[in-house]
Regions:
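Substrate-binding cleft of extracellular glycoside hydrolase catalytic domains
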Residues: 1-139
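Functionally critical loop-and-helix segments that line ligand-binding/catalytic clefts
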Residues: 1-12, 22, 157-228
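Sec/Tat-exported extracytoplasmic proteins
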Residues: 24, 32, 57-60, 88, ...
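Accessory recognition modules or surfaces
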Residues: 26-27, 96-98, 125, 152-168
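Hydrophobic anchor at the start of a short beta-strand
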Residues: 63, 142-144, 166
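Short beta-strand/turn micro-motifs composed of small residues
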Residues: 67, 147, 170
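Aromatic-lined carbohydrate-recognition surfaces of secreted/lumenal glycan-active proteins
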Residues: 136-154
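Cellulosome-associated attachment modules in secreted, modular CAZymes
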Residues: 225-293
Length: 293
């Protein structure tokens, strides 16, 4: 069942997160920072990041973070990743850390960078996004990518980036995006008690918090509680259902980014060859979609 989420930054002003929660929102993704459009490529902390994080946690919301990128090279992405890690240090996030990829700034304006991310080739942009996400992931964070439908479809090679969870921006009543996604931002003009003016709103389809906590990611200490027995092929996390998240865990395991129990390995080995591969992840993803017509 989907739950409601909002994403906020300093532009949303002073937020009453207790009212936000009372209005039925369970999740908030907070901008931690952004890279400026100027030629100096300045890395900036969001002016309300600390305040928003503290208040959202006190209100009992699930919290994630995002960083708005203007990276034009892999070196830029590494610089942004190091900055983001410094902002996240000492904090705990129940939701992923998202790389916001949507830069289309006017390159003809005075004093700004003469190129934007949309002007990069698919291979260049994919390498940049992968460099940032891989760096933050290896530092112990559950990482995702935020972008629009057409960017995911046309600007990035998602066969390379498919191990990262997707936060899809598509402002419509029903998205026709065909790729997997865990979060869907469906409007930039939502109204919610506790936030003045419009606010971005999303539906969250994946229950990230238990997985992040169990694996000891995003500032949490790994749970010492044994994993529940896995009794269903493809049900890697033992929740009784085969979902896209099981496929994601299996893909991460195939890349050496997860450690599975014996039971999890058996559940993930869809072809029975004794190995956990991307092919197993694809089969679990297919199974999660339900019976074929």
């Amino acid at each position: 069942m989907a739950t409601k989420a909002i994403d906020v930054s300093t532009h949303n002003g002073n937020i009453d997160f207790n009212k936000v929660k009372a209005a039925g929102v369970e999740n908030v993704i907070i901008r931690c920072g952004f890279t400026g459009y100027g030629r100096s490529h300045t890395l900036n902390k969001d002016a309300r990041f600390e305040e928003n994080y503290k208040k959202a946690k006190e209100a009992g919301l699930n919290v994630g973070a995002y960083y708005f990128s203007v990276a034009l090279t892999e070196a830029d992405a590494l610089r942004e990743a190091a900055f983001v890690l410094s902002l996240l240090k000492g904090k705990q996030f129940e939701l992923p850390i998202y790389y916001d990829v949507e830069d289309v700034h006017d390159t003809s304006a005075a004093g700004v960078l003469p190129q934007n991310m949309q002007g990069l080739s698919k291979a260049q942009l994919t390498a940049i996004v992968n460099r940032f996400c891989d760096t933050v992931e290896k530092a112990g964070y559950f990482v995702g990518i935020y972008s629009g439908k057409y960017w995911f479809r046309d600007e990035m090679d998602m066969s390379v980036l498919n191990r990262y969870t997707v936060w899809l921006a598509h402002w419509t009543t029903q998205t026709d995006y065909t790729g997997p996604y865990g979060l869907w931002q469906y409007t930039d003009s939502g109204k919610i008690d506790g936030v003045q003016g419009n606010v971005d709103m999303s539906y969250l389809y994946q229950d990230f918090a238990p997985i992040i906590k169990r694996l000891g990611l995003n500032g949490f200490t790994a749970s010492e509680t044994p994993s529940a027995p896995v009794i269903l092929m493809g049900d890697v996390n033992g929740d009784g259902a085969v979902t896209e998240y099981d496929a994601l865990l299996t893909l991460r395991r195939s890349a050496g980014l997860e450690t599975f129990t014996e039971a999890q390995n058996k559940a993930a080995d869809m072809d029975g060859d004794g190995k956990i591969t991307a092919a197993d992840a694809r089969e679990i993803l297919r199974k999660s979609a339900g019976p074929e017509d």
